[in-house]
C-alpha cells in the first residue's frame, strides 16, 4: 500500500516537472498534454524513438528539449530491463567493437618495431655526434691554416718594403714555394673530401641565377645571433638567408653561437622562399658530405605521386609529410607572421564601418581596410579569410558501425537513486547557495576596493590634516601589499609554530605493538601462507597498511621478490612509505620506497614498495607476470578506483598462471563477501577494531541548506555536549573555507565567555604542515572541530573525535559519454560511507553521529554502496592501456562491476579519432607510443604531435604545468593584487602560452622561490612541474624523440595543442559566450583567462569547470582550418551548397527600437 502511494506521489511530481518544462520552453502548461508526453516517454527507450513519436503526434521540439524531457521521465519510469541472458546476447551483437579477438602477439610485434626504431635513431644520433666532432676538428684546422696564412702575409709586407730587386726575385720564388707548401699543407685528403662534398650539392640546372626551393647549397656564415645565423650563398653573390636556431641540428641548440661562428663554411637547404627572404636549414643536410637527408622535390601540377609518397604538395603549394603522430606536417617558414590575417567582413559589418566613418566617429585612414590608392572607399582584401563552416564527421569506422553516438542513444550515468528525493533537492539547492555566497563575497571585495581613496598622498601634502587621516592613509597603503595575508580564522588555526605530524610519547616499537593487528601477527602470516588470495577486513587505524608488509618481510617473503602495496592516493603512498621506512629502520628509498606518477623513490635494494594503483597497472603493461613481486597487496580496495577495478581482473587471471604469487585485498568496510566471491570464494581475515558504541541521530525533517545546518549543529555540540572533538564532513575546498569563516564569525559573536573552538580544515590542496595540525590534541579547556572532505572517512585516523556531523554528501566525478564531458557533481553518499563516517566517532570512546537527513532518506535515497569509478568516469586511458596489453574483448573481460558499453564505445571512438586505433579497432604504432606516457590520451597525442611540428620543448613544459593543477595563488583578501600580477604573464594566444611564459620567467630567475612569492605563484606547484617535465623528458629520451624548440613560432605550438584536444573546440556564439563544437553546449571563458577580454572566434579548451556557469579552463586561440587538417576523422568542412546544422539551430534576433520593448514591433495575433 505504501509503495503504491509513493508511486502516485512520484507520478504527480513528474507531471508537475513536465508542466514546468513545457511552460518554460513552449509557453503552455496543460496537464493533459504533460500526461500524454509522459506516456510517450515511458514507451520510448531512446531519444531518437521519443523524438519520432513526438513528431508523429505533431510536436516539433528542439533536440536538447527532447533529451531533457526523456531524462526526466526515465528518472521516475526507467525503461523495462531485459533478462540478463538476452542482455548479454544483445550486447555481443549490438557492440561488436567491444568483442574483438585479443591480439597480444600483434602488440608485442609493435613493441619490438618501436624499440628497433629507437635503436636506429640512437645509432643515427651517435653518427651525428661523431660527425660533429670531426667537423669541429676540421674547423680548428681551417682556423689554424687561416692564422698561418695571415702571418705569412704580414711577413711578405715587411720584405716588400725593403725595395731591392734581388730580394724581390727571391720573394717571388719564395711565394711560389710557399704557395706550393700551403697547398700541400691543406692536404690531398682534404681536397678529395671537398670534391666528395661537392658531388652532393645540386648543380645549377639551366643556369638558374637564384636559389631554388629544396635545393642544397654551400655557403658561409656572415652574421651570428642568439636566435640563428645568416648564411651567404657561395654560388649566388649578394644572396643570403636565415637559419633559425631550431633548424641547425637534430639535437637542441639553445644559442646559435654555441654551434656556428662567423666565416664558417656550411651546407644549407632552402626550405622556404618569401619574396627575397630565404629560410634555410642545416639539420636536413649532412654537413660532412653535403647530402640532403630529407629530399623533397617540387612536383608538377600533373604529378599524381602525392597519393603514394609520404611527402606531397597541397593545393596551395605547401609540401607536407606524415610524422610519427600520423598528422600531415606542412613545411612552413619558421618566422612568425608579421600580422594576423584579416577575416572577411560580413555585409552588416561593412555597413556598420561605413556608417561610423560617415558620422565622423572613425577616421577613414585609421580603418585597416582603407584603400589608400583608390577612391577612399573600403575594399575587401584579396585573400581575406572566408568564414569557415565546420561540422562533425559522422562517418563511422568499420569496427564501430552502428554503435557510436550517431547510432545509439548514450545516456549519462544515473548517480541519484531517487532524482526527486530530498537529498537530490538539497544537493541542487546547495549549488545555488554556494554561487550566491561567492557573488556576495566578490561584491564585498569590490566595495572595499572602491572605498579606498584614489589619492593617498593628500594627507601628507595637507599641512593641517584631519585627526587620524594620516594614520588611515598609512593603513590603506598596505592594502594588497602582502601576498599571503591569511584570514583571521586561518591565523588562529595555523598562525603559531607549525607541527609536522601526530606526536606520541611511545617509542616506535611500542606504537606498533599497540595496534590491533599486532595480536594477530602469527595468524595473519599463516593465513597468507595457506591462501593464494586473502581478503583482510579491518577498521581504519588497525595497522593493515603499515604492518602487513613488514610482517611478510620478516616472514621471509622478500627472498622470492618484492612486496608491493597499492594506494588509491599519491599522498597516502608517500606518507605511508615514509612511516614504514622509519619503523623498518632504513632511509626512504632503500629497503622501503614508493613510486607515484612522475616520481620514483626506490632503489636496487627496495623490498617493500608502496605505489599508486595506476603505477602497478603500468608495471603490468611492461611485465604482465609481475615477475619482480612475491606478494601484491591491494589496499583500500573498498574505494573502487578505476585502476583498482582493472587490477582486479588482471590479477585474477595472473593468479592462475603464477601459483607462487600471493594476493591480499584489504578493505575498511564490511563488503568483504563481494570481494571474496569475486576472487574464487577465498577466505576472509577479520581484524577486530577498537571501536565503541556510536549513537546515531537523524533529523525529523529534510534540511534544505545542509551547510548552515552543519554549522548550527557544531555550535550546539560545542555549547551543550561534554568535551570531545568534532568532525564535520563537507564536499570541497570552497565549502570548507566558507564554513570555517562563518563558524569563526559566529563564535566571535558569542563573546569571550564561551570556551574556545579551534577550527581546522582538511583538503588535499592544503600544505602538509597545516594538515598535520589536525592530529594535535587541543589544549585543556578547548575543543577542536575538523572540517574535512571524505578523505577523513578512511584515509585519515584522528584520535579524540567523539562527535561526527554528517550532511550526507560528497563530490563525485561523473562522465557523460554523450557529451564527452566530465564534471564534479555533489551527490548523496552511500549507506556504506554513512556507516564509515559514523564509525569515526567511536574510535576513542562512546560517541554520537548527527546525520543531517531523515532515516527515510538513508534507507530509500542512498545506494547500499558507492557507484564504482569505472562506471562513472571517462575510460579513455583505461581502454588504451588494456589495448596496449592486447586485450580487445572488453565485453568478456572479468570486471567486478562492468562499465557501461556506451562508455567503452565512447572511449574507443575518441582513441580512433586520435589515431591510436585503426579501422579494425586494433592498436596502431602511434597508440602504443601514447600508452608509454603516463598521461591522458589527448595529452600523449599532443606531445607526439609536437615532435613532428618542431615544438616539443614548449609542449613538454605546458603539459607539466597543466598536470600540477592551479599554479596561481589568489588569496581572498588580496584578489585584486594577485590578478594584477597574473595579468603580467598573459599571452594574446591563450592560457597554454601563459603557463609557458610563467615557467620560462621562473627559469630566467634561476628557479627562485622569492620570485614566486612576489608574483602570487605557488612555488611548490612549479617545482612539481619541473619534476614532471624531467620524467617526461626521460621517456622522450628512451625512445629518442626529438626535443626541439619552436622559438617565437607560436603557430606550431597551437597546432600541437589542437592535434590533441580538437574535440574540445568551441566557437563564439553570436548571442552570448561560446558553443562547443561537439554538443553545441553553451560555455564561457573564465574571467581569470588571458582571453577573457579578447573573446576570439575559435578556441580550444583543456577542460570544463562548472561553477556559476560552465567555464572553459586553459583556453587557446586556434584557426578553424587546423581542425580539419589535424583531425580529419572527427571534423569536416560543411557542404557550401547546404545549410549547416549549426546555422539551422542558430536563433536569429530581429532588430528592434532600443527605446521600446523588444517585441513591441510584433502585430497582435488576429482572433477569428
UniProtKB/Swiss-Prot annotation:
One of its GO terms (molecular function) is ATP hydrolysis activity. Coiled coil: none annotated. Residues 76-206, 289-326 are annotated as: Disordered. It is an enzyme of class 3 (hydrolase). SUPFAM superfamilies: Nucleic acid-binding proteins, P-loop containing nucleoside triphosphate hydrolases. GO terms for biological process: mRNA splicing, via spliceosome. Belongs to the DEAD box helicase family. DEAH subfamily. PRP22 sub-subfamily. This is Probable pre-mRNA-splicing factor ATP-dependent RNA helicase DEAH5.
Amino acid at each position: 500500500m505504501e509503495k503504491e502511494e509513493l508511486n502516485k506521489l512520484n507520478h504527480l511530481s513528474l507531471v508537475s516537472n513536465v508542466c514546468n518544462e513545457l511552460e518554460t520552453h513552449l509557453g503552455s502548461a496543460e496537464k493533459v498534454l504533460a500526461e500524454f508526453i509522459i506516456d510517450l516517454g515511458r514507451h520510448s527507450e531512446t531519444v531518437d524513438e521519443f523524438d519520432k513519436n513526438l513528431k508523429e503526434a505533431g510536436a516539433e521540439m528542439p533536440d536538447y528539449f527532447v533529451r531533457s524531457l526523456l531524462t526526466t521521465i526515465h528518472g521516475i519510469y526507467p525503461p523495462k530491463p531485459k533478462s540478463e541472458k538476452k542482455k548479454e546476447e544483445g550486447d555481443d551483437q549490438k557492440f561488436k567493437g567491444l568483442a574483438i579477438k585479443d591480439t597480444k602477439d600483434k602488440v608485442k610485434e609493435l613493441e619490438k618495431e618501436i624499440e628497433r626504431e629507437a635503436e636506429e635513431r640512437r645509432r643515427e644520433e651517435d653518427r651525428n655526434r661523431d660527425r660533429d666532432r670531426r667537423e669541429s676538428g676540421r674547423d680548428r684546422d681551417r682556423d689554424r691554416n687561416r692564422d698561418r696564412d695571415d702571418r705569412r702575409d704580414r711577413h711578405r709586407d715587411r720584405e716588400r718594403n725593403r725595395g731591392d730587386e734581388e730580394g724581390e726575385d727571391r720573394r717571388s720564388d719564395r711565394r711560389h714555394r710557399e704557395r706550393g707548401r700551403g697547398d700541400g699543407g691543406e692536404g690531398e685528403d682534404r681536397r678529395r673530401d671537398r670534391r666528395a662534398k661537392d658531388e652532393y650539392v645540386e648543380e645549377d640546372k639551366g643556369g638558374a641565377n637564384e636559389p631554388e626551393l629544396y635545393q642544397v647549397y654551400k655557403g658561409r656564415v656572415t652574421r651570428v645571433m642568439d636566435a640563428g645565423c645568416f648564411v651567404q650563398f657561395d654560388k649566388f653573390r649578394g644572396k643570403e638567408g636565415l637559419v633559425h636556431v631550431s633548424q641547425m641540428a637534430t639535437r637542441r641548440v639553445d644559442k646559435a653561437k654555441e654551434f656556428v661562428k662567423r666565416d664558417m663554411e656550411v651546407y644549407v637547404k632552402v626550405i622556404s622562399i618569401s619574396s627575397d627572404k630565404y629560410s634555410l636549414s642545416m639539420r636536413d643536410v649532412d654537413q660532412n658530405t653535403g647530402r640532403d637527408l630529407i629530399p623533397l622535390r617540387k612536383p608538377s601540377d600533373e604529378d599524381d605521386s602525392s597519393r603514394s609518397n609520404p611527402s606531397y604538395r597541397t593545393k596551395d603549394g605547401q609540401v607536407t609529410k606524415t610524422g610519427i603522430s600520423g598528422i600531415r606536417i606542412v613545411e612552413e617558414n619558421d618566422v612568425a607572421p608579421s600580422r594576423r590575417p584579416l577575416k572577411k567582413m560580413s555585409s552588416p559589418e561593412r555597413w556598420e564601418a561605413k556608417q561610423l566613418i560617415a558620422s565622423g566617429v572613425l577616421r577613414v585612414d585609421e580603418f585597416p581596410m582603407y584603400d589608400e590608392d583608390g577612391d577612399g572607399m573600403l575594399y575587401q582584401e584579396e585573400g581575406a579569410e572566408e568564414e569557415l563552416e565546420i561540422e562533425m564527421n559522422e562517418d563511422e569506422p568499420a569496427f564501430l558501425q552502428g554503435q557510436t553516438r550517431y547510432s545509439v542513444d548514450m545516456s549519462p550515468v544515473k548517480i541519484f537513486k531517487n532524482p526527486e528525493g530530498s537529498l537530490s533537492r538539497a544537493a541542487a539547492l546547495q549549488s545555488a547557495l554556494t554561487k550566491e555566497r561567492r557573488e556576495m563575497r566578490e561584491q564585498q571585495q569590490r566595495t572595499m576596493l572602491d572605498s579606498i581613496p584614489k589619492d593617498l598622498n593628500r594627507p601628507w601634502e595637507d599641512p593641517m590634516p584631519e585627526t587620524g587621516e594620516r594614520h588611515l592613509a598609512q593603513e590603506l597603503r598596505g592594502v594588497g601589499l602582502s601576498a599571503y595575508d591569511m584570514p583571521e580564522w586561518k591565523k588562529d588555526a595555523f598562525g603559531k609554530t607549525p607541527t609536522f605530524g601526530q606526536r606520541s610519547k611511545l617509542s616506535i616499537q611500542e606504537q606498533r605493538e599497540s595496534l590491533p593487528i599486532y595480536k594477530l601477527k602469527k595468524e595473519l602470516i599463516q593465513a597468507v601462507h595457506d591462501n593464494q588470495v586473502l581478503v583482510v577486513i579491518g577498521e581504519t587505524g588497525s595497522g593493515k597498511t603499515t604492518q602487513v608488509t613488514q610482517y611478510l618481510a620478516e616472514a621471509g617473503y622478500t627472498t622470492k621478490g618484492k612486496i608491493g602495496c597499492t594506494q588509491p592516493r599519491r599522498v597516502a603512498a608517500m606518507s605511508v612509505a615514509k612511516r614504514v621506512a622509519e619503523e623498518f629502520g632504513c632511509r626512504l628509498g632503500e629497503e622501503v620506497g614508493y613510486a607515484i606518477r612522475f616520481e620514483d623513490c626506490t632503489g636496487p635494494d627496495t623490498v617493500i614498495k608502496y605505489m599508486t594503483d595506476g603505477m602497478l597497472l603500468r608495471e603490468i603493461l611492461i611485465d604482465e607476470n609481475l615477475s619482480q613481486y612475491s606478494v601484491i597487496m591491494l589496499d583500500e580496495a573498498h574505494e573502487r578506483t578505476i585502476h583498482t577495478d582493472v587490477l582486479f581482473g588482471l590479477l585474477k587471471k595472473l593468479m592462475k598462471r603464477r601459483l607462487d604469487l600471493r594476493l591480499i585485498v584489504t578493505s575498511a568496510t564490511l563488503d568483504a563477501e563481494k570481494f571474496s566471491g569475486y576472487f574464487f570464494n577465498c577466505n576472509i581475515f577479520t581484524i577486530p577494531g577498537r571501536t565503541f558504541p556510536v549513537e546515531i541521530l537523524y533529523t525529523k525533517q529534510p534540511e534544505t541548506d545542509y551547510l548552515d545546518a552543519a554549522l548550527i549543529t557544531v555550535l550546539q555540540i560545542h555549547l551543550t555536549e561534554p568535551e570531545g572533538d568534532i568532525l564535520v564532513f563537507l564536499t570541497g575546498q570552497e565549502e570548507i573555507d566558507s564554513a570555517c569563516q562563518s563558524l569563526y564569525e559566529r563564535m566571535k559573536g558569542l563573546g569571550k565567555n564561551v570556551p574556545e573552538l579551534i577550527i581546522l580544515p582538511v583538503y588535499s590542496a592544503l600544505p602538509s604542515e597545516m594538515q598535520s595540525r589536525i592530529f594535535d590534541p587541543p589544549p585543556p579547556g578547548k575543543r577542536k572541530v575538523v572540517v574535512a572532505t571524505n578523505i577523513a572517512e578512511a584515509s585519515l585516523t584522528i584520535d579524540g573525535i567523539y562527535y561526527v556531523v554528517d550532511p550526507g554528501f560528497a563530490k563525485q566525478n561523473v562522465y557523460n559519454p554523450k557529451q564527452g564531458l566530465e564534471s564534479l557533481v555533489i551527490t548523496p553518499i552511500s549507506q556504506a560511507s554513512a556507516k564509515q563516517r559514523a564509525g569515526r566517532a567511536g574510535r576513542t570512546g562512546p560517541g554520537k553521529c548527527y546525520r543531517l537527513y531523515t532515516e527515510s532518506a538513508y534507507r530509500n535515497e542512498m545506494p547500499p554502496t558507492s557507484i564504482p569509478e569505472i562506471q562513472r568516469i571517462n575510460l579513455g586511458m583505461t581502454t588504451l592501456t588494456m589495448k596496449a596489453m592486447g586485450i580487445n574483448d572488453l565485453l568478456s573481460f572479468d570486471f567486478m562491476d562492468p562499465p557501461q558499453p556506451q562508455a567503452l564505445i565512447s572511449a574507443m571512438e575518441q582513441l580512433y579519432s586520435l589515431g591510436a586505433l585503426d579501422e579494425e579497432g586494433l592498436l596502431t604504432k602511434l597508440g602504443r607510443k601514447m600508452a608509454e606516457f603516463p598521461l591522458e590520451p589527448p595529452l600523449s597525442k599532443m606531445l607526439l604531435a609536437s615532435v613532428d611540428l618542431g615544438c616539443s620543448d614548449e609542449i613538454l613544459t605546458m603539459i607539466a604545468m597543466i598536470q600540477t593543477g592551479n599554479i596561481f595563488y589568489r588569496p581572498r583578501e588580496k584578489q585584486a593584487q594577485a590578478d594584477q600580477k597574473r595579468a603580467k604573464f598573459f599571452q594574446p594566444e591563450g592560457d597554454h602560452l601563459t603557463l609557458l611564459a610563467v615557467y620560462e620567467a621562473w627559469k630566467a630567475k634561476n628557479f627562485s622561490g622569492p620570485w614566486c612569492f612576489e608574483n602570487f605563484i605557488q612555488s611548490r606547484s612549479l617545482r612539481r612541474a619541473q619534476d614532471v617535465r624531467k620524467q617526461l623528458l626521460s621517456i622522450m629520451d628512451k625512445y629518442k624523440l626529438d626535443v626541439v624548440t619552436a622559438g617565437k613560432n607560436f603557430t606550431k605550438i597551437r597546432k600541437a595543442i589542437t592535434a590533441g584536444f580538437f574535440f574540445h573546440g568551441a566557437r563564439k556564439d553570436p548571442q552570448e559566450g561560446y558553443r562547443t563544437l561537439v554538443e553545441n553546449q553553451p560555455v564561457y571563458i573564465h574571467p581569470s583567462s588571458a582571453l577573457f577580454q579578447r573573446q576570439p572566434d575559435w578556441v580550444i579548451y583543456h577542460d570544463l569547470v562548472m561553477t556559476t556557469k560552465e567555464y572553459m579552463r586553459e583556453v587557446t586561440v586556434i584557426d578553424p582550418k587546423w581542425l580539419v587538417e589535424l583531425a580529419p576523422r572527427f571534423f569536416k568542412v560543411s557542404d557550401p551548397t547546404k545549410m549547416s546544422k549549426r546555422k539551422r539551430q542558430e536563433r536569429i534576433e530581429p532588430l528592434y527600437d532600443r527605446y521600446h520593448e523588444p517585441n513591441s514591433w510584433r502585430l497582435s495575433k488576429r482572433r477569428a
